[in-house]
């Protein structure tokens, strides 16, 4: 009974991550729209950039998921069950999260270079502020997507379905 409660607690974090994944693109549109309006940039360029950003983030998210799946498969089920009973699964999740952060930062920087290359050529110094917003807009959904996949795979591994 205690094990099932802890498993349901981890599952609730998975639902929270899913909601954040769905909300993040709308927050991204608001931030970029406001920033570009203040700088009098072309809004069509902004919406085209948002579509590119979402497509590339989904692609990078799948690559991140495969990397995380490979890392999770190396963890024994007994060790995972023991960690959930003793530490609510935090030891295992933190071990995977360190790897997840590195992979997410790498792909975020790669996507940032691809997306901002032409923007820096057109807008020069004023694009510096956009670099920060764009990096956050790539990294946060990618990290949340990775966390969601990570927790889902962990739950299936615990139940013995992988």
Curated annotation (Swiss-Prot):
Keyword Transcription regulation: no
Gene Ontology cellular-component terms listed: plasma membrane
Disulfide bonds: none
Membrane association type: Multi-pass membrane protein
Primary localization: membrane
Localization annotation: Cell membrane
Identification of the protein by name: Uncharacterized protein MJ0792.1
Membrane-crossing segments per the record: 10-30, 50-70, 96-116, 125-145
Assigned keywords, A-Z: Cell membrane, Membrane, Transmembrane, Transmembrane helix
UniProt KW Thylakoid keyword: no
């Amino acid at each position: 009974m205690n094990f099932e409660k802890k498993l349901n607690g981890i599952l609730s974090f998975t639902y929270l991550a899913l909601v954040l994944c769905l909300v993040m693109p709308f927050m991204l549109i608001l931030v970029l729209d406001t920033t570009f309006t203040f700088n009098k940039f072309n809004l069509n360029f902004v919406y085209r950039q948002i579509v590119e950003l979402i497509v590339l983030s989904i692609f990078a998210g799948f690559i991140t998921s495969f990397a995380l799946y490979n890392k999770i498969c190396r963890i024994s089920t007994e060790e995972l069950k023991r960690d959930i009973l003793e530490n609510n699964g935090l030891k295992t999740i933190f071990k995977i999260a360190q790897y997840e952060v590195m992979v997410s930062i790498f792909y975020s920087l790669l996507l940032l270079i691809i997306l901002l290359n032409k923007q820096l050529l057109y807008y020069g110094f004023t694009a510096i502020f956009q670099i920060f917003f764009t990096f956050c807009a790539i990294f946060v959904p990618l990290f949340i997507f990775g966390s969601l996949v990570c927790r889902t795979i962990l739950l299936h591994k615990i139940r013995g379905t992988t």
